[in-house]
């Protein structure tokens, strides 16, 4: 509304807060749009945005902002302007003056304050080649903290899903006909991948044991591509702006994201990662469409006995592609995880969510409960405990304890099996889910 935006313009109507941004709620993602100009029109305001995000925002169809007649219009907030700094605890970085302005909380003394300014986006990068992969490195009891990620304030940020941002995207009219397995396609998109504090690519058996990933400006740990093996065990992921942990390709940069990914060289696929007994909490604090764990085009990945809480969107996402066509994904397992207090900000959501064809994959003996119910979601009824989304095929969903029987099977392919899920599942399964006894100390780390 014009009342809010007036603080960003001068008496002549010119934008004085030249780095101001709008963060716009878009169904299952939020977009960061840098404001180029503002024109107040009575009780409304017309806002224009910088490129490249302006074109992508108005040309891509999904996810989109909602404008409805029943009051479910998309929420937004304004940020990155000193003129908006009016609540204790807020800060603003003036990049031209090279100053940080901070509004102290009651009782805070700046003379005694510890101030940490992140300067890098990636702390550790492990990368070889397909023919000469980096092998057998173990990180143990190391804390990875305080990274930044500047791209949203330099080029905007229009995610498609799971924090993967569109580098290009547009609507197709008329729709593109695909093979008989898949419904017609109404859009195309190409994706970029957010930065990560620790990046692993073209490697074998890179392990993380009892490490901490905290206070990070984007993804915590990322097994990007061409990684075989690797154990992530007993780690804490907390206070992270984006995704906690990513595994596998979410479509290469030049690959249209709705096309199945099935490389001729199988070494390009991330396989045999084991993620267990980790605690994920306060994830996606800035990029609300992010998850605790997101695995894309992967094979033989095992995600088990983790606890996930306080996330803005889904807890675990497995798969990619929106297609029933068989691809490189197979033999994945999500087992005995405890997911609670999820969907703090976004709907079209579930504790565990799947995409695409994944032969011989299993979602079993997990426990999901306690969804948030924010008042600004696009559809207050569009939430689920378990959700097999577009193209999900050949996946067995069995013996999961959920506090209700609210599930969705949307545009699924063949071969899915749903058995014995809901509140009547044996309480032993509910009690066994989550961190095993030797790792419950993670819940008490300050």
PLM region spans:
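Active-site beta-loop-alpha junctions enriched in small/polar residues
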Residues: 250, 319-321, 357, 391
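Short glycine/acidic-rich loop motifs that flank beta-strands on beta-rich extracellular proteins
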Residues: 121, 148-154, 195, 217-223, ...
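Extracellular polysaccharide-degrading/modifying enzymes targeting complex plant/algal/animal polysaccharides
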Residues: 1-202, 207, 253-264
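Right-handed parallel beta-helix
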Residues: 135-146, 184, 204-218, 227-242, ...
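Active-site lining segments that contact anionic ligands and/or coordinate catalytic metals
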Residues: 19, 88, 97, 290, ...
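Extracellular beta-rich repeat passengers
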Residues: 146, 150, 365, 376-446
